[in-house]
Amino acid sequence: MLKELVLILMAGVLVNNYVLQQFLGICPFLGVSKKVNQAAGMGFAVTFVMLCATAVTYPLFTYALVPLKLEYLQTIVFILVIAALVQFVEIVLKKFIPALHKSLGVYLPLITTNCAVLGVTINNITDGYNFIESMISSLGVGLGFLLAMVLFAGVRSRIDNCPAPKAFKGIPITLIAASIVALAFYGFAGVVENLLA
């Protein structure tokens, strides 16, 4: 059981990284990754929302939607739960960490529409995970999002300080760098299974 939980966690962080392998959550990945501290703040906020969303949506789906045969409402119910959680996070950040709230700007409310958050809640159910496995999966996906954001912010800060051909400045060099980071994560595909075998 512990081995399976570690595998789920490592898969979420490295192998099935939602940003770099499944291309979910690209908007904040490209928009908030200019500074490492902003990227870390966004990564922690998204991880927190993912964990809270899973903690609420899993029992809601299992004990309310399924018994009432309302599974078709899954997406809309999950979006409403995520929106409420994001509002809660925004209120907490504004009250206790106003500098981070200001630096995240418009990207903080956009966590509501971050497809990575919705994706992890839906994928946990479609993958047949129980509650503990769903929470571990959400933690892994959130940490993977955080890792990708912070690594890419570091890469991006280096790119911004280096001369690049005029045609590559801005978005083109950013997308090229993102693809190289994604290729680096692709190298983890067989590592996790071999470590736990």
Give names to the regions the model predicted:
Residues 2-4, 183-197:
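Juxtamembrane boundary at the C-terminal end of a transmembrane helix
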Residues 4-19, 68-84, 136-148:
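Structural signature of hydrophobic alpha-helical transmembrane segments
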Residues 8-45:
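Juxtamembrane transmembrane-helix termini in multi-pass membrane transport proteins
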Residues 23-27, 31, 90-96, 107-110, ...:
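Generic transmembrane alpha-helix signature in multi-pass membrane proteins
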Residues 24-38, 86-100, 152-163:
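C-terminal ends of transmembrane helices
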Residues 45-55, 105-120, 170-182:
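Small-residue-rich segments of transmembrane alpha-helices in multi-pass membrane proteins
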Residues 59-105:
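Ordered, amphipathic secondary-structure segments that act as subunit-interaction surfaces
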Residues 157-176:
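Interfacial loop-to-transmembrane junctions
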